[in-house]
Amino acid sequence: MKTIDSIVTQAASIAAIRRDIHAHPELCFEENRTADIVAKQLTDWGIPIHRGLGKTGVVGIVKNGTGTRAIGLRADMDALPMQEFNTFAHTSQHAGKMHACGHDGHTAMLLAAAQHLAKHRHFDGTVYLIFQPAEEGGGGAREMIADGLFDKFPMEAVFGMHNWPGTTMGKFAVSAGPVMASSNEFKITIHGKGGHAALPHLGLDPVPVACQMVSAFQTIISRNKKPIDAGVISVTMVHTGEATNVIPDSCELQGTVRTFTVEVLDMIEVRMKEIAEHTAAAFGLTCDFEFERNYPPTINSAPEAEFCRKVMSGIVGSDNVLAQEPTMGAEDFAYMLMAKPGAYCFIANGDGSHREMGHGAGPCMLHNPSYDFNDELIPLGATYWVELAEAWFKQPAPVAAA
């Protein structure tokens, strides 16, 4: 495994920044303190910055030579609305807020890369360092784009990276095509007619109608889509009634839909609406159907994914670069990949043993109240960013950008 010496030398100071950010987590579009830290570090290293895209986003601009080519490297900054269980020194100081997905570590790895790139500009072009807010449900990537990210900072491609616990450190994973699913939510309100539970014939009970809908939705997955196409419909919330002897007036179903293609998503939305409305009508009831599309699928472009694989192989060896199996989780970096070529990869965060060395106890999985980013990963992640940036400008410009 290869890491850059100057990054290793500064790793402790970057880890201290990471732990400070971890101790002061900020939720979607509230990342003011974190953005201030990022902006100060970049400015101290002589990197010009632009603030305000996506409300709290920060973009650093590292330029060298006379080349007009450019790429973007992205890290997310926000935390999650959950209570941390850890008791180490850098545990969250804010009740109900926690860096449980490692965005503090993502920020730290990109800062470490920024520090090196500022001092050792071994490339001809511009590297845009994109520190993004509000990945956890806020669509910060979408907001940065809407505020002119790619208009103000034209780039040939954009790259993102996420830590992945449970895999031995020193490994990467990347693949072309869909790597994360779209995330969508639905809400169905079934309107009936309440009454006494002893006299069901005088009312219109929404509960059996809801049960029919829940079962029928699964036939969309098993009978309406191709078996080789992935799709998940999960009814995760059922709200109805307040008393055992009263037939309720209404019943509410909520849940999520996840797919890897827009085509499958389109079909699922249409069929869910048809099933909901027709099932309600068959029982003499009505319903309101709401469907909200959140994050689109994250789809890596093939040339950029292969480029990443080669860079990773040069750092950790080809045997340690895994094919990324698609996951039904969602990621708003998808918006950036809809606008630009690029790739989203994963870097192994270790098996969790780093947490038994004075860093608390418990599992180290994402969105777990005992999670903590592995600081030993900072030099490797930062080395990857630097190697990727330098290698990008050594290859010919993409045809579309030429």
Residue spans for each PLM region:
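Histidine/acidic-residue-rich, glycine-tolerant segments that coordinate divalent metal ions
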Residues: 58-59, 80-82, 86-98, 104-105, ...
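Acidic/His- and Gly-rich active-site-bordering loop/insert found
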Residues: 1-99, 108-111, 115-123
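Metal-dependent amide/peptide-bond hydrolase catalytic core
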Residues: 211-402
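Non-cysteine beta-strand/loop elements that form the S-adenosyl-L-methionine
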Residues: 74, 83, 186, 345-349
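A short acidic, glycine-rich active-site loop
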Residues: 95-104, 370-378
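A structural signal for isolated positions on well-ordered beta-strands in alpha/beta enzyme cores
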Residues: 50, 128-130, 288
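Divalent metal-coordination and catalytic microenvironments
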Residues: 21, 60, 73, 103, ...
